Each structure stands twice: as structure tokens, then as C-alpha cells.
């Protein structure tokens, strides 16, 4: 690491606009209805494939940028054939190492997100990104930088793979604990005079549709609110504090959620994510946006929210989700979704077990999530130093590189 930083001090660097050294190409429109089942990922406006097709329109290594939606501007790197849809690809010329370009784009991911335009469905355009200037050292130096940064990302990938394995174990036991078969058995053992009820969400709670909140309304302080997009990117399973605030005037017009309400995002790029929820456990009443619902029940909210994560619930979502580019699910459909409902005492016990699983999952194998975060921060730190050509960069805290 010291050698490469010394090299960068005297490196001759040329700055060029991306449009001068890269070719930007839009994808081809396709809908899930028109796709033919296959194993080629269709890359659109999300962070992962929208669905799969039987043919590709990009071969080899491809850098893509999501063109529209909540994740417009998201940068991806593909080493397999893909079908590029609602996104654009970036192909560098011979002056640029493709992997170097990818790391540089990641370094500027927040700037790319800031290119979003549109009040409805936001878009990011290649013509705007093409104006960004990129530092171009020699190809030899680019390769050395890539080698260093890839070591960080490979290690993070290994840690994430191990964490994913633990997550699969958790998912298995969660689905088993919340299965109708298991709940029927346990309910019978606990209370001979009670049966497991299969009920609809509408029978045990009430959905309230959100309204009116836009990100442009956000303030640094004021009345607490949650926007549907934040459920995907900012919040976990539960939340007791918000990240955004609005004025008294805006807040007075919003639907409100109370402690133990479940907040459900009902618009997404894909059917897997639509319906993602967060349990509000804060003491304050909060406002919430359109494209989401609150769900209020006298049952254990966390029990119901855990059930929202199961494969059984996912199948119900798939039957009712609508849309192609933007997937939606409606409150009147969710009211009809079925859920196995044991006595409240058993709900509480199951939640207690699953909460412990969650803690173990986040604390497993030498505090994996914390180590992943630490390595990711290391990667971001040295990416900043290596790709902005900061000659004063630190040479400390580099281990096992």
C-alpha cells in the first residue's frame, strides 16, 4: 500500500469527462409479460434482477446504471450475459480499465444518485453522468489500484457469503416456527381447549393508506415522519426513531401511525421486496407517506411482521401484486391475506425466540456484520485515497493487505 501511495505522488493524471472516454448505451424495453423464461438476468431500475429472460443483449463484463425508480443511479458490475432493460451500460475506451472505472463510479455513487430527476418516478440519464470528470492515471497504475481495492471487496464478499449462510439457517427456523403445522401442534399442547385459527389480516386489524409526503418536504427538525422509500433503504425490522421531519403544516395533513403499528411499503421494483415492513415502536405519533400503509392490530405486531417475511406470505403477495416496471400491492388485497394466529401468549413466546435469533444472527461468527462494516469502511477509505489522488493520504491502519 505504501508503494502505491508513493507512486501516486508523482503519477501523471489526466482528467477527462466520462463522455469523452466512455460509450453510454440505453437498454431495450421489455416487460415481464413479454419475457421468455430463462436464466439471463433482466437488469432494470432495481438493485437486483427484475426477472429472467432467455436471451441477452449484453455479453461479457458490463457496467450498468439503473435508469429509473427508487434506485435510479445504482451502479452494478456483471460478469455474465445480461438483458439490459430500464438502465444504461457504460463501456470505457482503451484508456480505462473497466474495473477501475467501476470502483470510481462506486466512489461517486452518492453524486450519481443526486442526478435523479422527476417528481413521480425518478430518472437518471447517461447524458448527465457523461459530464462527470474522471482522473485517468496510466493503465499500469489503474491495474495496481484495482488489485488493492479488489482485495477489500473480495474479503467483504467472503464475509457476506458466510453471513448469508447463517441467514438461511435463521430463515429456515423462522418459517418452521411460523408454519401452520408447527403452530397447530404447539397450540394444542399448550391449551387443549384452543385451536389454531387461520384468519385474514382484515379480521384482526385495520389498514390505513398514507398520503401526501414528498422528500422535498423534509426538514432537519420538526414533526417525525417516514417515507415509503426509506423502509427499503434506511430501516430494519423495527424502528423507534425517525430520520426525517416536516413542518406543522405538512404534518397536519398526513395520516398518522402510533406505537406498535406496522408500516408497509406497497410500491417496489420487484415482487420480492413489495410489502417490506417496519414495526414502529417509538413513543411519538408519526406521519407517513403515500405508497405505504399502516396496519394496526391488538395482536402482537412483531409476530405479524415476522410472518410477513415468510415464504408462505410471499406466495400470497405474488398472487396479488400488479404492475410491470413498478410493482404494487393494495390494501384491499392485503386485508384478505391469511395468517395462522395462535393465542397471544404463544405469539409472544414465538416473538421472543425470533428476536433472540435476530440478535444471534447479527452477532454470529466473530461479530460478522460489524466486521463486514469495518472492512467496507476500510475499502471506502482507501478507495477515496486511491481514486481522488490525495497525496496526503494516511499510511496507517493497513493490515493484511
Language-model segments: residues:
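Charged, alpha-helix-forming regions
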Residues: 1-401
Amino acid at each position: 500500500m505504501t508503494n502505491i501511495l508513493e507512486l501516486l505522488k508523482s503519477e501523471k493524471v489526466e482528467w477527462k469527462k466520462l463522455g469523452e472516454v466512455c460509450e453510454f448505451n440505453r437498454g431495450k424495453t421489455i416487460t415481464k409479460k413479454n419475457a421468455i423464461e430463462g436464466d439471463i438476468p433482466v437488469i432494470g431500475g432495481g438493485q437486483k434482477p427484475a426477472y429472467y429472460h432467455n436471451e441477452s443483449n449484453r455479453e461479457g463484463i458490463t457496467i450498468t446504471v439503473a435508469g429509473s425508480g427508487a434506485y435510479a443511479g445504482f451502479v452494478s458490475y456483471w460478469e455474465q450475459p445480461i438483458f439490459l432493460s430500464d438502465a444504461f451500460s457504460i463501456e470505457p475506451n482503451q484508456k480505462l480499465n473497466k474495473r477501475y472505472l467501476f470502483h470510481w463510479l462506486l466512489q461517486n455513487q452518492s453524486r450519481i444518485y443526486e442526478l435523479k430527476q422527476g417528481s413521480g418516478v425518478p430518472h437518471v440519464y447517461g447524458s448527465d453522468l457523461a459530464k462527470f470528470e474522471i482522473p485517468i492515471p496510466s493503465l499500469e497504475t489503474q491495474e495496481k489500484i484495482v488489485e488493492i481495492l479488489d482485495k477489500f471487496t473480495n474479503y467483504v464478499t467472503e464475509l457476506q457469503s458466510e453471513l448469508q449462510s447463517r441467514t438461511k439457517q435463521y430463515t429456515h427456523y423462522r418459517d418452521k416456527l411460523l408454519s401452520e403445522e408447527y403452530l397447530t401442534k404447539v397450540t394444542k399442547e399448550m391449551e387443549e381447549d384452543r385451536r389454531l385459527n387461520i384468519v385474514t389480516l382484515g379480521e384482526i386489524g385495520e389498514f390505513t393508506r398514507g398520503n401526501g409526503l414528498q422528500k422535498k418536504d423534509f426538514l432537519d427538525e420538526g414533526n417525525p415522519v417516514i417515507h415509503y422509500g426509506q423502509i427499503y433503504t434506511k430501516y430494519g425490522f423495527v424502528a423507534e426513531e425517525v430520520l426525517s421531519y416536516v413542518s406543522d403544516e405538512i404534518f397536519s395533513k398526513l395520516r398518522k401511525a402510533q406505537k406498535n403499528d406496522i408500516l408497509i411499503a406497497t410500491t417496489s421494483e420487484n415482487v420480492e421486496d413489495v410489502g417490506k415492513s417496519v414495526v414502529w415502536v417509538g413513543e411519538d405519533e408519526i406521519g407517513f407517506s403515500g405508497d405505504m400503509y399502516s396496519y394496526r392490530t391488538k395482536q402482537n405486531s412483531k409476530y405479524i411482521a415476522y410472518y410477513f417475511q415468510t415464504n408462505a406470505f410471499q406466495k400470497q403477495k405474488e398472487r396479488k401484486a400488479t404492475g410491470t416496471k413498478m410493482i404494487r400491492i393494495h390494501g384491499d388485497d392485503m386485508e384478505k391475506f391469511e395468517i395462522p394466529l395462535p393465542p397471544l401468549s404463544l405469539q409472544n413466546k414465538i416473538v421472543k425466540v425470533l428476536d433472540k435469533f435476530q440478535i444471534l444472527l447479527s452477532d454470529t461468527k466473530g461479530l460478522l456484520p460489524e466486521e463486514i462494516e469495518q472492512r467496507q469502511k476500510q475499502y471506502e477509505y482507501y478507495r477515496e485515497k486511491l481514486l481522488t489522488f490525495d497525496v496526503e493520504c494516511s499510511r496507517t491502519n493497513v493490515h493484511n493487505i
